[in-house]
Amino acid sequence: MKRITLWCMVLTGVLLAPAAGFAQISCSREGLQRAVDLYIAAQTKGDTSGLPLAMGVGYMENVAPADINKGLIKTPMKIDHVRSLLDTATCQTYTEVIVTDKEHPYVFGTRLRVNHDKIAEVEIIWTTTGYWGFGADAYLNYSSEEKWDTIAANKRDTRDTLVAAANAYLDAFLEQKKDLVPWGYPCNRTEGGAMHTGRGNADDSCDVGVPSGVNISNRRFIVDPAIGAVVAFCTFGAGNVNGGSGAPDAHLFRVESGKLRFVHTVTHLLQANFQGGQRGQRGGPAAPGRGAPPNQQ
C-alpha cells in the first residue's frame, strides 16, 4: 500500500511539473518577470514552444495584427540589452530590446499582456537598418550607461503622476505648450539610437527640437512606479499630411521626483519616407514599412 501511494505521489509530481512552471506567470511582479524571462528565452531562440501562450493569443507588429508563426518573435537573435517595465495594475509588461548583430541589428519594444497564467497578447514595435534614426550600437551605448534603478517606496511617483508626465511631453508636440512639461535636469533623450541629446552636463535638457502640429495619438500606457517608468505605445501623428505620418511609435520615460530624466523612442518608419525638415515631422500621409522583418521578406 505504501509503495502504491508513493508511486502515485511521484506520478502526480511528474504530471504537474510543467503546469507548475507555467503557473509562475501571474500579475504579481514576480509572475510578470517570469513572463518576461520566458519571452526573452523564446526570442533568443526564435522558438515560442516554451511560452505559455493563451489559446487564440493576439500577436501584433507595428500596430497591425500579424501571424505569430511568421513574425519577428520567430527570428533567433543574440540580445545585447533588455530593460523591462512590470505593470501589475494592468497585467502587462514592456521590454526594450537591443540587438547589435552586424547583419541583422534591431531595436524594438515588446508588450506582453498576461491573463492568469497565460500570455494573452504579444505586441512588438521594431526598427532596423534603413529605419528612421536607427543606430543599435549607439542605442546600446547610451541605454547601458543610464541608471533606471528601483526607487525607494517612499520616494516613488504615483501611477497618475507618471502618465501625466508622459502625456504632457507628448501633448507638447501638438501645441508647443512646453511650459507644461515637467522637464528635469539633466535629461537625456535617445531616438532610434542615431539621435541623442546630452553631453554629460548637469544642464542637459530634453527640451530641444520639439516640433508643433504633430498629434501623437492612439496612446496606450504601461506603467511601473517601482522604477519610475512609463511607456506610451502610440502613433506619431494621426496619419494625415499636416499632423504627422501615423508611424507606429513607442516613447519610454524615466521620471524621478516628478521630473523627466530619460526619454527613449522607437519609431517604425523607413528613413526613405521621412519627409520632415525638423525633428518630429516623421513621414508623409501614410505609415510605411509595416511588413515582415527585413530578413524574412
Q: What is the predicted function of each stretch?
A:
Residues 1-9:
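Bacterial N-terminal signal peptides that target proteins for export
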Residues 8-18:
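Bacterial N-terminal signal peptides
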Residues 22-297:
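C-terminal and inter-domain tail/linker signature
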